């Protein structure tokens, strides 16, 4: 187990070859893109300015992990270990990723790009999408109760196919809730 370390740049590939458990570590400018991180456990870790695009994450554990300014294209969080999955994203690009059937109560997606991201059957209750772009994101049979979408843009959420009780939306983006009804709003 590697604990309490600052891990920068290219050293991460060598570490992943020999170690599978990281606790209280900070990863800065590391390239995990297309890397095999299946079965690796990250606990109380922070990733800053890292590239995790297309990383393979089968049974990967993320417990109390924060991602800041990371590029994370095409990731399948639905393949991660669901036990204790707690993550937060700040200024991250998560386009074309999948959170299918994951439980992420209270999650924060702050100022993120979530273009064409799949949230089908995902529990996002009490989460926040403040400042995030949800263009083409897919919500179906998702729990969005008490979610904050007030500062989010370009979302399209069908209220008849998702749980949205007590969720908060801005007047400017209300058309994202009504587009499924083919209404003319002027």
Question: What are the residue ranges of the model-derived segments?
Answer:
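Tandem repeat scaffolds
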Residues: 1-186
């Amino acid at each position: 187990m590697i604990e309490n370390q600052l891990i920068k740049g290219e050293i991460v590939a060598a570490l992943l070859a020999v170690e599978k458990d990281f606790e209280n570590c900070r990863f800065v400018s590391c390239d995990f893109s297309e890397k095999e991180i299946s079965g690796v456990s990250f606990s109380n870790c922070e990733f800053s300015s890292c590239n995790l695009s297309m990383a393979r994450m089968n049974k990967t554990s993320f417990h109390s992990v924060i991602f800041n300014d990371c590029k994370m294209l095409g990731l399948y969080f639905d393949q991660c270990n669901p036990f204790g999955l707690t993550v937060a994203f700040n200024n991250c690009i998560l386009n074309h990723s999948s959170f299918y059937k994951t439980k992420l109560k209270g999650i924060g997606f702050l100022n993120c790009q979530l273009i064409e991201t799949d949230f089908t059957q995902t529990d996002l209750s009490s989460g926040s999408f403040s400042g995030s772009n949800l263009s083409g994101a897919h919500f179906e049979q998702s729990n969005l109760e008490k979610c904050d979408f007030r500062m989010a843009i370009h979302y399209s959420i069908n209220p008849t196919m998702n749980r949205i009780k007590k969720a908060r939306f801005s007047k400017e983006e209300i058309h994202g809730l009504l587009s499924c009804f083919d209404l003319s709003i002027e």
